[in-house]
Amino acid sequence: MCSTMTATMNQTICEKQNITMDLLRSPIQIPSASDTIKIETPSTISSQPSPIQTPLAAASSDNFERPSLSYKDLIIEAIDRSPEKRLKLNEIYQVIRLLHPYYRHRPDQWGWQNSIRHNLSLHDCFVKLPLKQTSASGVVGHFWTVVPELSDKQTLRRRNRQQPRALAKKSDAGRTLSRDDRGSSGSGETSPSPSQPSISPPNENPMPSVQALNVLELLSGMNDYKGTLFQNNYRTNLIQDNSAVNGLQNLLTTTLMQINPQLGALLSLANLNNLTTNQLQIASPSLSPIKAESQSFLLQ
């Protein structure tokens, strides 16, 4: 029995040794760097690129024609394409990239986006609409919309910005003219230059308005002045008739009618002819009233 067990163990040991020798004799294959590892992918995964991915570096804006629209028209086009006719700033960028590949493939994305922001703040046809909700960072955003009535007109914001500049230019021009006038007066020149109009100083005593004139006082003063003029001329024997008085009357009447044509009725009521020859009974200048009185007294 012992001999049988010993023979079985020897046979098992021999078989193991044979298997070990066979493994040592077989060549061992080591993979090289040139070998590729093939990994099978599921058939459900598509090999087409996603439209959200960044364009390849090989594509550039040189391969696409730049649109002829201005930045203002690009913004209006993007907002009109939206269903609610309003877009956020990033949405305006996305619509412009989608409609015009030139801006999608431009390397300087910040350049044309900065121009979009500038035109939004420049033209008054673009209006901000506040958002009702806030973003995750707590920043309140806003929509941009277009006012159709102002889309075809010039911007009011640009005119408002130019008005202070225009006023400053006018004030500078006025100061330059005043300096030129002082220089010309100091050098003895009397005639102003034809290219530089003369600026007259404002009148310190402005004329009163027609409404402030007291017509009755003016007419009464005119009659007093006529009487004084007649007496002075009579005493000095300078006039033989009342032609000077009538000329003064006609001059004053014409002046008043030019100031206000409605004074004709008042002039007729004032009785401007109360100092004519028929009423004043002019005596001969050769004999004064005092001498005539003394002669009549002596005759009595």
From Swiss-Prot:
Location(s), subcellular: Nucleus
Gene3D superfamilies, sorted: Winged helix-like DNA-binding domain superfamily/Winged helix DNA-binding domain (1.10.10.10)
Tissue note: Expressed in mechanosensory neurons.
SMART domains: FH
Ranges annotated as biased composition (Low complexity): 187-198
Compositionally biased spans, kind Basic and acidic residues: 169-183
GO MF annotation, one: RNA polymerase II cis-regulatory region sequence-specific DNA binding
Matches recorded under InterPro entries: Fork_head_dom, FOX_domain-containing, TF_fork_head_CS_2, WH-like_DNA-bd_sf, WH_DNA-bd_sf
Region listing for Disordered, in residue ranges: 153-208
Gene disruption: observed consequences: RNAi-mediated knockdown severely impairs axon regeneration in a daf-2 mutant background, in a daf-16-dependent-manner. Impairs short-term associative memory in a daf-2 mutant background in a daf-16-dependent-manner. Reduces longevity in a daf-2 mutant background.
Pfam families with a match to the protein in the record: Forkhead
GO cellular component, one term: nucleus
Effect of residue 111 to E: In qd197; suppresses larval lethality and defects in the endoplasmic reticulum (ER) in an xbp-1 mutant background, when exposed to the Gram-negative bacterium P.aeruginosa
Keywords attached to this entry: DNA-binding, Nucleus
Function: Transcription factor. Binds to the regulatory elements of genes that contain the sequence motif 5'-TTGTTTCT-3'. Involved in regulating intestinal transcription of vitellogenin vit-2, acting in concert with transcription factors elt-2, mab-3 and daf-16, and also the TGF-beta/Sma/Mab pathway. Functions downstream of the insulin/IGF-1-like signaling (IIS) mediated pathway, in regeneration of axons after injury and in short-term memory, perhaps acting in neurons, and in modulation of longevity, perhaps acting non-neuronally.
Protein name as annotated: Forkhead transcription factor fkh-9
Gene: fkh-9
